Amino acid sequence: MTTKKRPVGKKKFVSFSDDDALSRTGRLPKNLPQHGSPPVYVRRTWQTIPFHLIVLSYWFIKHSNGYDVRKCTWLLVPCQVLYLALQFNPATVYGNKILKLNYALLAVSGVTCILLTIPCMLLVVLFGAPFLEMLDKTWLLSLHCCVLSYPAVYSVLNSDFKVGFFKKYFISIAVGCWISCLAIPLDWDRPWQEWPIPLVVGAQLGAMFGYTFCSQL
């Protein structure tokens, strides 16, 4: 007596995302790196180019009053929220779906970024930043970097903590910040060489590169 084999269906997965908040997309790219199941990636389109960072960097370098890092950071906050809502999140694909914007998670991600300033500041200090002398400026630099990473932080939380794909955005900000340190010891005596002005610009350039080129084709 022969028995019929049951057809093997597609493997199911558990997601913490609300199915009602999902909309279908097309097929997944063939060259998509796997960072767990279901995969998550950001489509590389003109939509993910952070035009606001280009404008903000130009304003900070050319027109800000004494390279005001504090004002630049406060201006960056709403820009990053709008960039996430209107550009980055619509290009983020989770499995074969696009997650709709989670307004509660926007606030949670903001709080997360503030909490991340502490380990970020410690990391900056370990790399040789002044601690006791310029603690407020070092914290402002850390806050600026964390705000730059806000879209990536939100996406990690919104895709069930799949850090694998989004770590490249954090790395690009850190590398840009680190490379810009080379401008500080130069014997030029320029006002923009003061701590942490070069690192703020470097972090912005790193974020521009990351959000523009680190997405998936």
Swiss-Prot record:
Pfam families: PIG-F. The keyword Membrane applies. The chain crosses the membrane at residues 45-61, 74-94, 111-131, 138-158, 169-189, 195-215. GO terms for biological process: GPI anchor biosynthetic process. GO terms for cellular component: endoplasmic reticulum membrane. GO terms for molecular function: mannose-ethanolamine phosphotransferase activity. It comes from Eremothecium gossypii (strain ATCC 10895 / CBS 109.51 / FGSC 9923 / NRRL Y-1056) (Yeast). This is Glycosylphosphatidylinositol anchor biosynthesis protein 11. Belongs to the PIGF family. It comes from the Eukaryota. Keywords: Endoplasmic reticulum, GPI-anchor biosynthesis, Membrane, Transmembrane, Transmembrane helix. It is a multi-pass membrane protein. Pathway: Glycolipid biosynthesis; glycosylphosphatidylinositol-anchor biosynthesis.
